[in-house]
Design a protein with these regions (language model features):
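Active-site C-terminal subdomain of aminotransferase-like
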Residues: 1-100, 104-133, 137
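PLP-dependent enzyme catalytic core of the Aspartate aminotransferase-like
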Residues: 109, 116, 132-187
Length: 187
């Protein structure tokens, strides 16, 4: 999120002095600073962080509401939805509900086809840039787990993770809707 362009990996450690000291010792051994170029990219990009995050929040909320009533979506996981079990906590703790959401595709939709049929939203490994992206945990982040291990972590074969970017919400809704319809027809 900090860079917004999927071109750097950076962050900060916010913790107690004891933990910071441990991280500092490890960083001395492994290297804990960005290259000059990465630091420049981060400094450049952080200026637009508030507007990017605001738009990502807006788009994620719009997608969650749209998908929550879509006949080809079995479930939407997004704390901005009143139906989400963590909604009240998120409402108290956060100014927005974030740019990430997860969806369970209807059993009639093959996840691979759904991803293939997307035109604007890109299937990728990393999330949280300015472009909207989708990720299929079964074949990416949770690939090495058995079906049982994935099930224990609530990672179903139909789960897709979406990272809302800053594109037009109308375009994003149309992209998902078209992909779902095309994917259903290809079965």
């Amino acid at each position: 999120y900090l860079g917004g362009h999927s071109d750097i990996s950076a962050g900060a450690v916010i913790s107690s002095k004891v933990r910071i000291d441990r991280v500092y010792e490890l960083a001395k051994s492994l290297g804990g600073t960005l290259s000059e170029f990465s630091a420049w990219l981060l400094e450049r990009s952080i200026k637009t962080l508030p507007i990017r995050v605001w738009q990502q929040n807006e788009n994620a909320m719009g997608l969650a509401n749209f998908l929550n009533s879509h006949s080809l979506i079995s479930k939407v996981y997004y704390p901005g939805l009143i139906s989400h079990e963590g909604h009240e906590i998120a409402k108290r703790q956060m100014k927005g509900f974030g740019g990430m959401l997860s969806i369970e595709l209807h059993p009639s939709i093959k996840p691979e086809l759904f991803l293939k049929n997307l035109k604007i939203i890109k299937p990728v490994m990393s999330l949280a840039g300015i472009e909207s992206t989708a990720n299929y945990p079964k074949l990416t982040s949770h690939y090495s787990l058995t079906d049982k291990e994935r099930s224990l972590q609530a990672i179903s074969d139909q789960l897709i993770r979406l990272s809302a970017g800053i594109e037009s919400i109308i375009d994003l809704k149309n992209d998902i809707d078209n992909s779902l319809k095309w994917s259903e027809n290809e079965n």
